[in-house]
Amino acid sequence: MTPQPRRRLVLASQSPARLGLLRQAGLAPEVLVSGVDEEAVTAPTPAELALALAEAKASVVAAKPEVHGALVIGCDSVLDLDGQALGKPADAEEATARWKAMRGRAGTLQTGHCVWDTASGRHVSATASTVVRFGEPTDDEIAAYVASGEPLHVAGAFTLDGRSAPFIDGIDGDHGNVIGLSLPLLRRLLADLGTGITELWAPAED
């Protein structure tokens, strides 16, 4: 029996971290940025906002003619601190204030996931949550971290796999979800659409 050709996989995100997670899991997605105006999307809670943003990104890319037949993944992450949704800080001043508010405390990183099957027109979505326990960096350490520029490009002004890693005491939940994508949740969403994640593995290199 002739094996079915591997489905195209499209990541509706410009995040190098999400792309890296997918590649490490044996997947080889194409990248097509949605261009969604994130500031225009609102929702009552941080978890609902993360999901709404993920759904918006995936739906915009799924509607493009050039991806017809592909599976499209959209994700977005938001830090929930005291019920407030914290995305990327607007500037260095805001990033500094965020870190001074977060240190010694815990927040919940909410990552919305949406997968569109453009062949069938079906889509599924869900949110994964991971508790992040922040350490207590000094004012000088916060200033140095903000000066590096890294916190200006990531949700919550921190990243688990970058320069802020020493300032995070631990997490409760999925490590990948904090970086930007929960692979266990992605597997379940793909299964809901009738696709096994192993069917999407890229051929092993010789």
UniProtKB/Swiss-Prot annotation:
Q: Which reaction does it catalyse?
A: a ribonucleoside 5'-triphosphate + H2O = a ribonucleoside 5'-phosphate + diphosphate + H(+); a 2'-deoxyribonucleoside 5'-triphosphate + H2O = a 2'-deoxyribonucleoside 5'-phosphate + diphosphate + H(+)
**What EC number(s) would the UniProt record show?**
3.6.1.9
Location of this chain's protein in the cell = Cytoplasm
Q: Does the keyword Hydrolase apply?
A: yes
The protein, known as: Nucleoside triphosphate pyrophosphatase
Q: What does this protein do?
A: Nucleoside triphosphate pyrophosphatase. May have a dual role in cell division arrest and in preventing the incorporation of modified nucleotides into cellular nucleic acids.
Q: Which domain of life is it from?
A: Bacteria
Q: Quick one: a GO cellular component term?
A: cytoplasm
- Into which family does the record put it? Belongs to the Maf family.
* Keywords per UniProt: Cytoplasm, Hydrolase, Nucleotide metabolism
Q: Which cofactor does it need?
A: a divalent metal cation
Which residues, by range, are in coiled-coil regions?
Answer: none
Instruction: List S-S links within the chain.
Output: none
An individual GO BP term: nucleotide metabolic process
Which CDD domains does this chain map to?
A: Maf
> What sort of enzyme, by top EC class, is this?
hydrolase
- Which InterPro entries does the record cross-reference, listed alphabetically? ITPase-like_fam (IPR029001), Maf-like (IPR003697)
Please name the catalytic residues of this protein: 76 (proton acceptor)
GO MF, one example: nucleoside triphosphate diphosphatase activity
